[in-house]
Amino acid sequence: MAPPTPSPRPGPPPTPQAAMTTPLKTPASKHRLHFPAMTPRNGGGGGAAAGGTEHPVEVIGRIRNLAAGAGGASALEIAGGGTAVRVRGDAGGCRDFTLDGVSVSEEEDLEGFYRRFVRSRIEGVRVGAKCTVMVYGPTGSGKSHTMFGCAKQPGIVYRALRDILEGGGGGGGGVSGGGGEGDGRGEDDAGFGMGLFVQVAVLEIYNEEIYDLLVGSGANAKGNAPKARLEVMGKKAKNATYISGNEAGKISREVAKVEKRRIVKSTLCNERSSRSHCMIILDVPSVGGRLMLVDMAGSENIEAAGQTGFEAKMQTAKINQGNTALKRVVESIANGDSHVPFRDSKLTMLLQDSFEDDKSKILMILCASPDPKELHKTVSTLEYGAKAKCIIRAAHAATPRDKMSSEESSTMLNSRIVAMNQFIYNLQKENKLREKERNEAQSVLRKKEEELAQLRAKLKLIEGQGAAAKEEEINSKVMEKTQSLRTELMKMEEKMLRQQQELLALQQRLKEVEREKPVQQDIIGGRLLARLSEMSARADQSMSMDMSIDFDMGDQPAAQDVKVIKEDTRKQGQIWSQANTAGSCTSAVEQEDDVVRLSGYPEKVVLSTVFEEGDEEEDKDSGVEEEVCKEVVEESYVMQQPLAEPEDPATRNNRIQNIFRLCGNHRELAKKVQSPAKKAFGDENNEPAKQTFGDENKQQPAKRVFGDENKDPSAWGAIEPPMCDVRVTDSPVSSQLSPIVCQVVDDAKLPVSEQLKSCNALEAADENKENNASGQDGLLEVYIKWESGHLIKGLKLLSNSCLSDLRKLLEDHFEEAGSKQQQQFTFLLLGDPSGAPVSREKEAGVPISKLPSCNNQPNSYLACLRAVKKQPATEQMPFSPLESKLNSALNDVHLAALSPKVNPMSPNYIRELRA
């Protein structure tokens, strides 16, 4: 069978049988160039025409094996020595299609197919040629399998990458056969057996839009990363991403990874049908070579594919649009049209350089199926390939290599050497640049290591300094604490030294006081004797003095005093007489534990008589009932007059008469007051007292009961000015006055003997005499009252007494009164402008004379008490042992100095003195 190319000579007339079959020749075109058929050469890679034209498109057929489920015989046969495909129709006719080569997958695998038809094109790319390998055919014909292969058989893409980067072996024959001059010249034409540096881009054309599959396919990219949409500018995709490198394995893995991102869908025609065109662009910048691998989507019928839905129909329509645009471009070029519609599709726009560039070659692989059901698709594909094979390009006549002169050969070789030298220079330059970068990186790394070493040394230094600073800080704190403790120790030593000096001074003072004690006792005894004698001398003038005092008091009413006197029937013989006991009833002295407590007489109030209670415990033991005698005694007031010349008798009588007129019948009113019932000491008697009056100028004698009179008088010591325990009762006259009580202050622990508390009613005159002479023997009268109340007590103290002595007497009085809760109090200095009370610590340093004067009387003072509310105890630092001892020593010495020791006095001794 003749080749499908037209012949210049007319052929024989057709026979009737030939007229019934499919035409064997491609229809001629009016623009088609007619040239004689030429015999292909061995080792050719698409032979050139004998004249001045060449075929830029080489068409190879790839027939897949028959599907396992398909029935019937194959509809395709290989004819013409493996360069033609015969298609048998259903009616028994056949049609032959002449191609540049045919390969059957049952007889030849992908590796054999690649070595036989593709490797020669790849070797041309390695030396700077440009080649486009596109796979065309209906869906399910094996296009993607031929281009990408499978795990066991790599496709054209991966084999081409390996050959370009790693350098393939010698050439396998061209389309016309193997062997010949081309064998053994492949490596010589390449110049080296070394790998090259390439750049690879992977594009996808889906629904007439170009997408970059390499975008979002990095190691850190997610699987559902969006694809980047690109635009065509200058026959190329703008801003496309490239994979650069010279390692075939690495680039192959990247391409395999992004190839899986293509849009694939299952149809009735193909279980895994590609719904987009895939284009892999591989550039070799060092030699200017370029390889484009195009896996086209298969054209299909919408109804036959079973596509439903708008999106599926749109996909099929866009696929068919691209394939149809490529057919029109091929027909236009083959027909020699002046206008080629490259811009009808994005696919044809990217393939424009492949059709127009004189140095570019196109290898079109037609994939077909031998299934009789796909016969119409197979015929359409073969017609498309036959049409593309008719494309010719007017080019300069190629000079045969065997006819080239030595000069031309040397020129070509020199140009190749220059190119290789330039490439080597670029590689060396790049190597130097990388070496420089490596040196810089090493220097930076070295600097970083030095900085790291410095930082480590600095860190160690800082840690050492920190430890040293911390230790120094600790030492400084220890030194400061030690210094402060030393300073405090020195202060304590100084304080101890001062306290020792004070202690020595106090001990010296104590010795002086002990030496002065006998002298003081002698002085006190002398004063007592003098007063007793004076009281005895004035006993006769007591009655007249009472009247004078009543008149001198003016409008001040007389207070009535009622005292309960218990008489012991067993000791009637031991009652003192009035004359012998008048002085002893006015004073009492007790000594308990070598401590002497002093009491005095008030100047303003003169008690006419005092009655003492007997020892109740002895009475209870004896079982004898006591007889109670009550007597109302009128109390007189004495107004102390300054020492002056006696007044004229006439003037005195006139003044007494005026006073009597002003005072009225207060004495008659006083007689009607009832005597109160017996009460404990300190209780107020609000009821009128029952009183018994005799002669106004006489005092009824009362019975006195004393203790044991047989005691040895030697047991009695010096007697200080005594104080009488009295009870002041209210009356219509005396209720206008503040009650004043003079009491002998007893020790709380050791009560006073009943011998010193007994007296009789006839001693009132002597007491009046003593009251008139108060203040003459160095005694001070102190009247006690609460801050917002009446007078509650009157005391006599030594002139050198202080507030602490007065506090002790008052506390003993409160304790003797039997109060369940002893109320705390403080002293007020009414003359102090601030009104602040005297603190208890300062009472020992405040003398009695600092108290305010009472009614402007000399040696008469008023002590005002303020109740102290109990406050929660506050935490106080305890005294050191030395301070505690010092305070105790100070208090003992002070008490000893103020209260010299005296021996108890016997009543017999007092009788002897009075006699």
UniProtKB/Swiss-Prot annotation:
Signal peptide as annotated in the record: none
Pfam families per record: Kinesin
Gene Ontology MF, one: ATP hydrolysis activity
Keywords, ordered alphabetically: ATP-binding, Coiled coil, Microtubule, Motor protein, Nucleotide-binding
Coiled-coil regions, chain positions: 426-517
A GO BP annotation: microtubule-based movement
Keyword Coiled coil (UniProt): yes
Gene Ontology cellular-component terms listed: cytoplasm; kinesin complex; microtubule; phragmoplast
Binding-site positions, ATP: G137, P138, T139, G140, S141, G142, K143, S144
Bias-annotated ranges (Pro residues): 1-16
Positions of region (Disordered): 1-28, 34-53, 676-718
Cross-referenced PANTHER family: KINESIN-LIKE PROTEIN KIN-10A, KINESIN-RELATED
Protein name according to UniProt: Kinesin-like protein KIN-10A
Organism name: Oryza sativa subsp. japonica (Rice)
Taxonomic placement: Eukaryota, Viridiplantae, Streptophyta, Embryophyta, Tracheophyta
Gene (name only): KIN10A
